[in-house]
């Protein structure tokens, strides 16, 4: 979809760059890239293309949205970010949380995802139940990412590769463990591990395994496992689209 990005002031652009520097330092110091990426994704992934509600508009800071089961643990991210936000009040929460996701990927060795400022904060959080369920298969992934958010099959597989960062926590999701050997390094190892089968100590969710059994998803898994550069290019595009759902639509 064509975008018509708002023009922001020089002062606002300066605030964005200051926030970027502060985020780099925080994420490097606290090794919290996976948590910040999850915050950005869960903030944006509530967008519903038919009703034009939800999306990356700063509502994750509300107790109502933080209480959604899929967001368990994200209150930690919100609390970690608040001192920077208080220091840089000019930037919207909407931009700030998406910028945190962009910086998380960059600091971890991933691609430089473009960032366009100008999202405005919205007061009302989306209803619960719009984020993907890790226990379900490819039909569910297409319903949530495709029909609800308006993303493509390629976007679904590329974004799944973001699980190269982080781990599941039993108390948050019911699952336990990392997807890869180095959960703080953004690379294509999610795909290589997925293709190599179950391994002790590494996690493969039902939604991960669904990528292998689907005739459209599996060739993309194989492509990204063989070609990290191709994965980075497609991930960059998919992350950008996710971070701008409902924002600056022409």
Curated annotation (Swiss-Prot):
The keyword Iron-sulfur does not apply. The record marks 38 as: Transition state stabilizer. InterPro entries: Ccp1-like, Haem_peroxidase, Haem_peroxidase_sf, Peroxidase_I, Peroxidases_AS, Peroxidases_heam-ligand_BS. The active site is at residue 42. Residues 113-137 are annotated as: Disordered. Its cofactor is heme b. Heme b binds at residue 163. It comes from the Eukaryota. It is found in: Cytoplasm. PROSITE patterns: PEROXIDASE_1 (PS00435), PEROXIDASE_2 (PS00436), PEROXIDASE_4 (PS50873). SUPFAM superfamilies: Heme-dependent peroxidases. Plays a key role in hydrogen peroxide removal. This is L-ascorbate peroxidase 1, cytosolic. It comes from Oryza sativa subsp. indica (Rice). The gene is APX1.
